[in-house]
Amino acid sequence: MSSRKRLLDYLEREKYLRTKKVRKAMEEIDRENFVRSSDKYLAYDDTPLSIGQGQTISAPHMVAMMLEVLDLKCTDNLLEIGSGCGYHAAVASRMVSQVTTIERIRYIYELACENLLEFDNINVVKGDGSCGFIDNSPYDKIMVTCGAPNVPPPLIDQLEIGGLMVIPVGGRVAQELLTIERTFHGISVSRRPGVAFVPMIGTNAFES
């Protein structure tokens, strides 16, 4: 049994993976292509890994959980805040029409650009993720992979009516994972405690 299959079987048993489309997307993307050479032997362990500059590639269970919550559709226009090494966007790109992913750190931005060069439906942008990216809005789904002190208002503004956003909100170290639906009357929010993401830095987030 391959290491990847063993990991995905584990994620299914633990109920992080619930749908065939998310499993298929994770089967199609080699996580080992997005981690440091020295960490390739850990690529299919369920753990976050450093990618440099204080940033990480999320643990596979968190990738699966966020993608399942978003219920991605083949017609979706998706915004990701925090490109990292590009793995999260790569998996999501298998399920949606278009991905815009924003990264503020130049080294990490360049890493994502290199890793995502062959993905023709992913647009990597260097900028302040807390401001979103209005040029490609509105978005059907927004996936935030860094922890914010509050939900940045521009992200709500750029979310389509009926759209979903998943975002860690709390402190610099520990957060709750919020699922936000934008409606004609405002927003509805559900919460899952006990997640840990690197902090979001920006105009509408933490100071550097």
Model-identified regions with their sequence ranges:
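Conserved nucleotide-cofactor-binding alpha/beta core module
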Residues: 71-188
